[in-house]
Every structure is written in structure tokens, then in C-alpha cells.
């Protein structure tokens, strides 16, 4: 039964984060070496081109983990622990970049305080950090409303609809919204679904039967197809910066469950080799 439990996501959460970090690393650093336009080249190119989906996996498991944290600690402790976990490394990176990018003191503080993230471009300095810190800051308020909802799935769906309406309104009615900013706001849906899954993990057990696994595999396959459609073909799907939204949403949720199952199989059936692989991903997950 354990090998088909949704709680596998929680058990292998660190390893899933390690895989996400590895995929992001491929996106930034991997050089495609196969013969151009061969089948292997196309596979390599796709894996590299879609590597930013690892970010969505991070948003998903972050939302999931925050539910446990907010229930375990006071609000003050919650904020302090989140800040200590992520900000010091971000600040030190900013110091290092002062010397490589010739920042003055004002530019440095505008970057490490996240001001430029909101006023100029999200890609000024490790955009994920000010993005996730923003969500950490707002999470307790959101979770307060979430906890009071009688039907949390319906509540999450309503927030989804509100997000979609605001996204389309910003693009089509307000206009002049920085395109790069959608790279952040399009990750909000996966974060709030992570919160929903975290709540489910805390309260009840869900066992995946064959139909649920088939549905999960189908959802992952659909995400891969949409990633090809948006990231490789460059087509739009519903919202601006589509490749950072619906494709990665499906990949992050379904892929996380499939990864958890794979890690469980490695842990169960390939004791020696499996432990080595799991240790590598665990180290990457902790480091990330």
C-alpha cells in the first residue's frame, strides 16, 4: 500500500527538490552535444529547453511544505525560519555580484531588497528568491482563509478562477504590464495547489489505484505535449508566457507523484544502487 500512497510525495519531498534543481541546472548549463536534428538531439534539446519546469516543482513542494510548517510553528517562528533558510545565501550572492556587475551601493540594495524585482525586471538577481519570499509573506493570510473554507478544493478552484481573470485583465485591459512579471505570477496556481495537497497529506490518506495512476500518467503526458507546443513551437496557450503556466502545472503535479513512485521503487527494489541515487538527489535537494 505504501508504494501507492500520495504520502510518497511528502516522504521523498527533498529528493523531488533535488531532481528539480538538477533539471534547472540542465536548463542553464547543459550543452546539447548530439548530432543536430537526430532523435537524441531532439530529446536533449527538449529536456534542456523545458528545464525551467523545475522551478514549478519547487513552487509546488514549497506550498506543500508550508502547510506543515505553519501548523508546527508560531507565525513569528514561521517567518524567521523561512527567512533564515533562504535569504542569507541570496544576500551573499548579491555581494559577490557587486564585483562582477559593477553595482553601486544603491543598485545592490535595490536588488537584494527585491525592489528591482517589482520595478524593473524579475531577472535582476535570482528571481526565484524574491518571488518565493513574496509568497511566504502572503501565505499565512491566505492559509487563514483556506483553513476556514468548508470545501478546500472548491476554494482553491475559486482562487484559480480569480487568478485567471486578473491575469487576462492585466494583459488585455490594463495593458503595459511587463511581460517578464508573468513568469512569476503564472506560478501562483501551482503554489496554491501545493497548499491544497499539503493539507490533504496532513489530514488523510489517498491510495492510488490503477485508474489514478493512469490519470497521473496522462496528465504528465499532456503537460509534456503542452510544453512542446509552448516552449519548442513558441505557441501561446490561454495566457501570456504560457510556457510558465499550464504545461509546467501538469508536469509539476503529476511529475512529482511519478518521481515519488520512482524513488520508492529505487528504495525498495534496488537497495544499493537506489540508495546512491537517492542520496545524490537528497544532497541536491538540501543544497537547493
What are these regions (language model features)?
Residues 192-198, 203:
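Transmembrane alpha-helical segments that form core, pore/gating elements
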Residues 184-188, 202-287:
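Alpha-helical transmembrane segments and terminal signal-anchor/GPI-anchor hydrophobic tails
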Residues 43-55, 117-131, 170-193, 225-258:
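Interfacial loop-to-helix transition and helix-capping segments at the boundaries
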Residues 1-169, 207-213, 257, 268-284:
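Membrane-cytosol interface segments of multi-pass membrane proteins
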Amino acid at each position: 500500500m505504501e508504494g501507492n500512497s500520495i504520502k510518497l510525495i511528502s516522504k521523498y519531498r527533498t529528493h523531488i527538490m533535488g531532481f528539480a534543481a538538477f533539471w534547472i541546472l540542465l536548463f542553464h548549463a547543459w550543452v546539447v552535444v548530439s548530432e543536430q536534428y537526430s532523435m537524441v538531439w531532439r530529446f536533449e534539446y527538449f529536456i534542456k529547453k523545458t528545464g525551467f519546469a523545475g522551478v514549478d516543482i519547487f513552487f509546488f513542494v514549497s506550498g506543500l511544505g508550508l502547510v506543515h510548517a505553519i501548523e508546527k510553528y508560531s507565525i513569528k517562528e514561521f517567518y524567521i525560519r523561512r527567512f533564515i533558510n533562504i535569504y542569507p545565501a541570496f544576500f551573499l550572492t548579491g555581494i559577490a555580484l557587486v564585483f562582477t556587475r559593477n553595482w553601486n551601493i544603491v543598485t545592490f540594495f535595490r536588488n537584494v531588497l527585491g525592489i528591482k524585482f517589482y520595478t524593473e525586471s524579475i531577472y535582476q538577481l535570482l528571481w526565484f528568491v524574491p518571488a518565493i519570499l513574496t509568497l511566504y509573506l502572503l501565505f499565512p493570510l491566505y492559509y487563514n482563509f483556506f483553513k476556514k473554507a468548508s470545501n478546500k478544493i472548491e476554494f482553491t478552484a475559486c482562487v484559480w478562477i480569480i487568478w485567471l481573470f486578473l491575469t487576462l485583465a492585466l494583459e488585455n485591459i490594463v495593458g503595459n504590464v511587463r511581460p517578464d512579471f508573468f513568469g512569476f505570477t503564472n506560478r501562483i496556481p501551482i503554489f496554491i495547489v501545493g497548499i491544497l495537497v499539503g493539507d490533504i497529506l496532513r489530514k488523510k490518506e489517498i491510495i492510488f489505484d490503477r485508474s489514478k495512476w493512469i490519470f497521473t500518467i496522462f496528465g504528465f503526458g499532456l503537460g509534456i505535449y503542452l510544453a512542446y507546443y509552448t516552449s519548442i513551437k513558441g505557441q501561446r496557450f490561454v495566457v501570456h508566457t504560457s510556457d510558465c503556466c499550464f504545461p509546467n502545472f501538469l508536469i509539476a503535479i503529476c511529475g512529482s507523484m511519478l518521481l515519488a513512485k520512482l524513488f520508492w521503487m529505487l528504495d525498495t527494489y534496488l537497495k544499493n544502487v537506489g540508495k546512491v541515487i537517492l542520496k545524490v538527489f537528497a544532497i541536491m535537494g538540501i543544497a537547493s
